[in-house]
Regions:
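Glycine-rich phosphate/pyrophosphate-binding loop at beta-loop-alpha junctions
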Residues: 1-45, 88, 92-127
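Active-site-adjacent helical/loop segments in soluble small-molecule enzymes
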Residues: 36-93
Length: 127
């Protein structure tokens, strides 16, 4: 999540970066103060890294819930937002696997997710 971007900052700088305080992101499953020493070397092997803002996390949580009729964990919805951004940069058709899990959303986060109606904007790969 963009507001809990310790991993992205660590990748950019080449050393583990720490957040000064816990963020209030919808994607609480990815909200760490810093990446672990065992995890960081694996992150460094990635070809890219996407930071997804809270609006996109809410957008994809709503759309996945609407389309699949299941409560999707906002952290998984964040991954969907990153995949869509990646797909927009591809010049040929790609096959992508996004693993979705669900159910772990407290009432306050659910209210925040549905505060705005994102279902009025249909998902698209158009830039």
């Amino acid at each position: 999540p963009l507001i809990a971007n310790d991993a992205a900052e660590s990748i950019r700088t080449g050393v583990i970066q720490s957040l000064s305080e816990q963020s209030n992101t919808l994607a609480d499953g990815a909200a760490t103060l810093q990446v672990g020493e065992k995890t960081f070397p694996h992150l460094q092997t990635l070809n890219g890294f996407y930071e997804v803002d809270e609006t996109k996390i809410a957008y994809w949580t709503q759309w996945l819930q609407h389309l699949l009729k299941v409560h999707v964990e906002p952290t998984c919805a964040m991954c969907m937002g990153a995949v869509v951004e990646w797909l927009k940069s591809q010049s040929s058709e790609q096959k992508v696997l996004v693993i979705l899990s669900g159910g772990n959303i407290d009432q306050q986060k659910m209210l925040k997710i549905w505060q705005d109606d994102h279902l009025q904007k249909v998902p698209s790969l158009l830039i």
